[in-house]
């Protein structure tokens, strides 16, 4: 009888216990938590289910909802039981500090990705610094300079492919992803899949629009993970000898020669590191260049492209010669184009939380003068997507205006595509090099019909025009870690004409 009663009442007891636990948790979070004093919607501070609803049920909408909450509650906001979000860019350097100020990642946000072995997914400050130190030399400005010939070769392959595809439709997000994937695979493993030169291989370079479907993302990255793990395994067991044929060391052969302890050179950790390197090095740069391609070919931007082409014609009188990256970086209009690509393309849209484990961060609301003490150990974030579209910083923020960077060089501090601080994106110099060289190669030789006679050498190979592509094909409508466009998008498509 007692056993039977216990068996039948146990579910009820567990349910009551769960309800009481949740009530106590809600009460603590609302009234006694160190974050209870901060502004925000009460339900957001009570439970993660509020964020879950906006990000999972509504598909990547919490970033946009946070922006709306800031309009109501002010520049500092509690967005879940443990995290604060700040919309004030002047506080950016406090959140993403440099030098010897410790900043950890928040394990709650990095654990679900399954990339804790990578530099980007490493939470503790000291472990992150150790892992990053092994990779820093490969991504330094000086070492990326040594890669410029390889990048230029890939850009030339892309131009040659455009010549072959005259009067055909090309998905430039595929074409750019093929190019960036070739480059990062070469630098990582010494292997060149030659995707940039072949239409049928380009679509396998992690196509961007697949990100509009979660199931496709899972399948895509699982397949890529198996391939990358095998690449790392071959490096570990010594069967990959491709690096011996390269003038520059590959990243993962170099890691094996580094001073990292043996446990940091195990297969699973290096495979996670490699997957992040390949994925980010392929998708992000390809997407921001694709966004730039749209804007340079969009209706009403004829004078913009003409200005760019005239600058490139002066800087590159003979396009058959190798391109000099240092010379390109000095071109003001090309630099403005690159930065507008980064601002409107974003690269990543997810919040990148930072924890100051041993500091109380002090934030002063510029509107009210109220001072907020942020307790040590609190995850704090700021969204680059919000800053890049802030009309108080970027006038007419939805417009692609390269001139803004020439008119106001101080805008540089608000360009947050690669984050900042001690955890800034490792690949920043590689991404910049790819963008400068590829955009210069393409638009030195291709223009558009409407631009009229050129002031420079008449060696144009042809014209580019958009094909059934609209502005909405470039706009971020959901935060899926990277920007996701509307579900019906066919990508950013162009047509090559004579």
From Swiss-Prot:
Subcellular location: Membrane
GO cellular component: membrane
UniProt membrane topology term: Single-pass membrane protein
Swiss-Prot/TrEMBL catalytic activity: preasperterpenoid A + 4 reduced [NADPH--hemoprotein reductase] + 4 O2 = asperterpenoid A + 4 oxidized [NADPH--hemoprotein reductase] + 5 H2O + 5 H(+); asperterpenoid A + 2 reduced [NADPH--hemoprotein reductase] + 2 O2 = asperterpenoid B + 2 oxidized [NADPH--hemoprotein reductase] + 3 H2O + 3 H(+)
Top enzyme category: oxidoreductase
GO process annotations (BP): terpenoid biosynthetic process
UniProt keyword list: Glycoprotein, Heme, Iron, Membrane, Metal-binding, Monooxygenase, Oxidoreductase, Transmembrane, Transmembrane helix
Cofactor or coenzyme needed: heme
Gene Ontology MF terms: heme binding; iron ion binding; monooxygenase activity; oxidoreductase activity, acting on paired donors, with incorporation or reduction of molecular oxygen
Biotechnology: Asperterpenoids A and B, but not the final product asperterpenoid C, exhibit potent inhibitory activity against Mycobacterium tuberculosis protein tyrosine phosphatase B with IC(50) values of 3 to 6 uM.
EC number: 1.-.-.-
Family: Belongs to the cytochrome P450 family.
Functional description taken from the UniProt entry: Cytochrome P450 monooxygenase; part of the gene cluster that mediates the biosynthesis of the asperterpenoids, sesterterpenes that exhibit anti-tuberculosis activity. The first step of the pathway is performed by the sesterterpene synthase astC that possesses both prenyl transferase and terpene cyclase activity, converting isopentenyl diphosphate and dimethylallyl diphosphate into geranylfarnesyl diphosphate (GFPP) and further converting GFPP into preasperterpenoid A, respectively.
Protein name: Cytochrome P450 monooxygenase astB
Organism, as annotated: Talaromyces wortmannii
Lineage: Eukaryota, Fungi, Dikarya, Ascomycota, Pezizomycotina
């Amino acid at each position: 009888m007692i056993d039977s009663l216990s068996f039948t009442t146990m579910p009820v007891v567990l349910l009551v216990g769960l309800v009481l636990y949740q009530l106590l948790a809600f009460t603590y979070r609302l009234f006694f938590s160190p974050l209870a004093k901060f502004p925000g919607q009460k339900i957001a501070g009570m439970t993660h289910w509020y964020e879950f609803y906006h990000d999972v049920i509504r598909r990547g909408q919490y970033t946009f909802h946070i922006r709306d909450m800031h309009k109501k509650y002010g520049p500092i906001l509690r967005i879940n039981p443990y995290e604060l979000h700040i919309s004030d860019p002047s506080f950016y350097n406090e959140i993403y500090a440099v030098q010897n100020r410790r900043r950890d990642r928040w394990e709650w946000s990095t654990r679900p990705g399954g990339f804790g072995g990578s530099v980007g997914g490493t939470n503790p400050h000291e472990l992150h610094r150790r892992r990053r130190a092994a990779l820093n030399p490969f991504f330094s400005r000086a070492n990326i300079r040594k890669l410029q010939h390889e990048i230029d070769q890939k850009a030339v392959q892309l131009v040659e492919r455009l010549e072959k595809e005259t009067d055909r439709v090309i998905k430039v997000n595929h074409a750019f992803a093929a190019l960036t994937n070739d480059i990062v695979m070469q630098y990582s493993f010494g292997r060149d899949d030659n995707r940039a030169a072949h239409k049928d291989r380009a679509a396998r370079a992690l196509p961007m629009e697949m990100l509009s479907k979660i199931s496709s993302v899972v399948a895509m990255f699982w397949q890529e993970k198996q391939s990358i793990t095998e690449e790392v395994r071959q490096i570990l067991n010594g069967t990959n000898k491709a690096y011996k044929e390269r003038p520059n060391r590959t990243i993962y052969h170099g890691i094996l020669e580094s001073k990292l302890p043996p446990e940091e050179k195990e297969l699973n950790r290096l495979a996670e590191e490699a997957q992040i390197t390949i994925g980010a090095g392929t998708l992000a740069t390809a997407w921001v260049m694709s966004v730039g391609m749209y804007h340079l070919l969009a209706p009403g931007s004829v004078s913009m492209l003409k200005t760019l082409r005239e600058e490139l014609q002066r800087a590159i009188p003979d396009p058959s010669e190798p391109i000099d990256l240092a010379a390109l970086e000095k071109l003001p209009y090309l630099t403005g184009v690159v930065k507008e690509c980064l601002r409107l393309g974003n690269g990543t849209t997810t919040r990148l939380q930072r924890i100051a484990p041993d500091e109380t961060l002090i934030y002063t609301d510029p509107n009210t003068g109220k001072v907020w003490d942020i307790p040590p150990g609190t995850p704090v974030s700021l969204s680059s997507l919000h800053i890049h579209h802030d009309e108080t910083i970027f006038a007419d923020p939805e417009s692609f205006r390269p001139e803004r960077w020439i008119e106001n060089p101080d805008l540089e501090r608000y360009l947050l595509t690669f984050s900042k601080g001690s955890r800034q994106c490792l690949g920043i110099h590689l991404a910049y090099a790819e963008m400068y060289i590829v955009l210069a190669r393409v638009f030195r030789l291709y223009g558009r019909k409407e631009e009229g006679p050129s002031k420079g050498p008449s060696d144009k190979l042809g014209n580019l025009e958009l094909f059934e592509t609209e502005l909405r094909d470039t706009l971020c409508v959901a935060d899926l870690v990277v920007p996701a466009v509307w579900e019906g998008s066919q990508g950013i498509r162009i047509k090559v004409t004579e």
